[in-house]
A protein has these predicted regions:
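Conserved ABC ATPase "signature" region
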Residues: 109-128
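Conserved ABC ATPase signature
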Residues: 132-137, 141
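Conserved catalytic motifs of ABC-family nucleotide-binding domains
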Residues: 154
Length: 255
């Protein structure tokens, strides 16, 4: 269970990037942090594993204040997937996926077995991808390696910052639903950042909607659609429908 209590981040005299955020994420939940660009989603995510230190407030993981945990040890227990996956170009798929295990001092045989397991999990079978360099991979395949790398140390918590945003629509959908399958199979707790409301509604058990550093509303996709807290939430939740209507009009005009 993850709990954010009065979590805030301020840079100088500017308005807070995150302002007094209170949120509880249950174990095994898939929570989406959603909202427009610049609303504080990534800052919030980065305070959970202390890549960014809060100006005020606390993060509790399974009842333990993260301020009481060494930040390096904390990050080793949490999987993190970025939009820019950042694979080492001179290292093979297997070496990239197993880098955290190597740094942790695991034996080569143990690393090899775990990497093969992870590559199968993310649908990159080792017999085809083990020795391939990142430059020979598609964007979706590189992101799959990033997911495998994040899962290598068997974290219970996964933080994902716009992980599918740079991919083409077909690859994005395929990888997103594959990750949801992994989330359920491994019984992970996942916090995903996105501004794509279609993605948020399809993947999230709940959506935490943010605006200008503040948490506006939290609920299931159905709850936010049927009872939005204000016009902003209503507009955000209706954006997939507006796009669908616009597309239908374009298709109708072409007939």
């Amino acid at each position: 269970m993850i709990e954010l209590r009065d979590l805030s981040k301020q840079y100088g005299a500017r308005a807070p990037a995150v302002d007094s955020m209170n949120l509880r994420i249950e174990g095994g939940e898939f929570l989406v942090l959603a909202g427009p660009s610049g609303c504080g989603k990534t800052t919030t995510l980065s305070m959970i594993n202390r890549l960014i230190e809060p100006s005020r407030g606390n993060v509790f993981i399974d009842g333990v204040d993260t301020h009481q945990t060494d930040p390096v040890a904390l990050r080793r227990r949490i999987g993190f997937v970025f939009q820019d996956v950042g694979l080492f170009p001179h290292m093979s798929v297997a070496e990239n996926a197993g880098i955290a295990l190597k740094l942790a001092g695991k034996r080569p045989q143990e690393i090899g077995a775990r990497v093969d397991e992870l590559l199968a999990l993310v649908r990159l079978p080792a017999e085809h991808f083990h020795d391939v360099l990142p430059g020979a991979l598609s964007g979706g395949q590189r992101q799959r390696v990033g997911v495998a790398r994040a899962l290598a140390a068997s974290p219970r918590l996964m933080l994902m910052d716009e992980p599918f945003g740079a991919l083409d629509p077909l690859t994005r959908d395929e990888l997103a639903f594959d990750y949801r399958r992994i989330h359920e199979r491994l019984r992970l707790t996942t916090i995903l950042v996105t501004h794509d409301m279609t993605e948020a509604m399809l993947l999230g058990d709940r959506i935490a909607m943010m605006r200008e550093g503040r948490l506006v509303q939290v609920g299931t996709p159905h709850e936010l659609c049927s009872a939005p807290a204000n016009d902003f939430v209503r507009a955000m939740m209706e954006s997939p429908r507006r796009r669908a209507r616009a597309l239908a009009e374009v298709q109708a005009d072409e007939k």
